[in-house]
């Protein structure tokens, strides 16, 4: 056999090497597509957006609390959790926390509006956290624009890494 340096057309194996928080999102990135040998690993850039959008899509503090407690209890009481299951449980906890806090923005707990409860605690939360439909629409538009612009910048950086500055400027 012959050992050569990889060229752009080669199909070489890819090993993602993220640490800590970002490593938890690698299984999700692997579901879509691994980067090529000479491309950026987008996992660190993908993770925060996925976390926020997952929370906004599920958006119920009751579900978030349920998922968080379920993953935490499983982690505490299960014996011999496999090495592949630990990061999945951590990912569930992070996504559940995002869901819980996004549920506080909308004021839902298992589908019920918690801000209709006439208790001072919930009314204070409503004044500080609650977002009505217009606020949520504006937030989603802003997040969408930020994500698209950020993706375009990442594409330009990736093009610059692969082909040079003239390709980065052209994107």
Residue ranges and their predicted role:
Residues 1-171:
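Conserved, carboxylate-rich catalytic/transport cores that coordinate ions
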